C-alpha cells in the first residue's frame, strides 16, 4: 500500500494532457464516492486518522533523515494536493461511504491518491490508499480502486497503473488479488515506511487487460 498522508515521499512528475480530464473530479458507484479533499473535511479527516493511528502506522510513509518536511496541517495538505491535481500530476480523493446514496449520512471511509502521473512513452501512475479499520473488508477500497483505474485509463489516457504493497500487508494484497492486478515481483527497500526503507511487492494493470473496464469486471465478480 502506498500511503497518501502529508509526508508521502511520492513526488508527482510531468502529466499527460487530455481533453477529457479537468480537476476537480468526483466519481461515484453505488454508495462509494471519490471526492476531492476540501478544507471543510479537515475535522473528519483528522478524527479518522487519529482513531486509526495504530492501524495505519505500519504502512505509513515516513521521511528519511534530512528530507524537507511536507505540509504540517490539513489546510496545507489540501492546498498542495489541489495545486498538483490541477496540473494533472496527481488525483487526490477522499473515499466516502454514502448509505443509501444519502449525502447527509456520508461517512469518511479512507483516502485514495493516484500519484506520480506521467505521460508520453511512460503513460502511467501509482495508486495508494488507506481505509478506516472499522470499514475494512466491505469492498470499499476495491471499488474505489476500480473507479480510479477506469478514470485513469479513460479520461486520463494512461496505459499502466501500479500498486506497491509491503509483503506483510495481507489485507492490501487481497485487494489487488480481487481486482486481478498482475504481480511483477519484489522491489527491495523501495519506499521509506514506518521509519525505514521497506521491501515492496509491485502489482500492475495495463489498459488493454480490462477493455470492459475494471469496475465492470469487479461488479461481475461480486455477483452471486
Show the residue positions of the predicted features.
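Generic, well-ordered alpha-helical segments
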Residues: 37, 48, 66-73, 87
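A short helix-loop-beta-strand connector motif used in the catalytic cores of GNAT acetyltransferases and
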Residues: 65-66, 78-94
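Conserved GNAT-fold acetyl-CoA-binding loop/helix
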Residues: 57-79
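Residues that form generic nucleotide/phosphate-binding pockets
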Residues: 48, 59, 77-80, 84, ...
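Acyl-donor (CoA/ACP) binding surface of acyl/acetyltransferases
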Residues: 1-44, 48-55, 92-224
Amino acid at each position: 500500500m502506498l500511503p497518501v498522508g502529508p509526508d508521502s515521499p511520492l513526488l508527482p512528475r510531468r502529466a499527460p494532457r487530455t481533453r477529457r480530464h479537468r480537476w476537480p473530479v468526483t466519481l461515484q458507484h453505488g454508495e462509494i464516492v471519490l471526492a476531492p479533499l476540501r478544507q471543510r473535511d479537515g475535522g473528519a479527516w483528522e478524527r479518522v486518522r487519529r482513531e486509526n493511528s495504530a492501524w495505519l502506522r505500519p504502512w505509513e510513509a515516513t521521511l528519511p533523515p534530512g528530507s524537507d518536511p511536507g505540509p504540517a496541517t490539513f489546510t496545507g495538505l489540501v492546498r498542495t494536493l489541489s495545486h498538483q491535481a490541477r496540473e494533472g500530476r496527481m488525483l487526490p480523493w477522499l473515499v466516502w461511504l454514502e448509505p443509501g446514496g444519502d449525502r447527509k449520512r456520508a461517512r469518511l471511509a479512507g483516502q485514495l491518491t493516484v500519484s506520480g502521473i506521467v505521460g508520453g512513452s511512460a503513460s502511467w501512475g501509482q495508486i495508494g490508499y488507506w481505509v478506516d479499520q472499522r470499514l475494512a473488508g466491505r469492498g470499499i477500497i476495491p471499488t474505489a480502486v476500480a473507479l480510479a483505474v477506469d478514470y485513469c485509463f479513460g479520461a486520463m489516457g494512461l496505459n499502466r497503473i501500479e500498486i506497491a504493497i509491503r509483503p506483510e500487508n495481507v489485507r492490501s494484497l487481497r485487494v489487488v488479488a480481487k481486482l486481478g492486478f498482475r504481480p511483477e515481483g519484489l522491489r527491495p527497500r523501495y519506499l521509506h515506511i514506518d521509519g525505514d526503507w521497506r521491501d515492496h511487492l509491485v502489482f500492475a494493470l495495463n489498459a488493454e487487460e480490462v477493455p470492459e473496464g475494471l469496475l465492470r469486471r469487479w461488479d461481475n465478480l461480486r455477483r452471486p
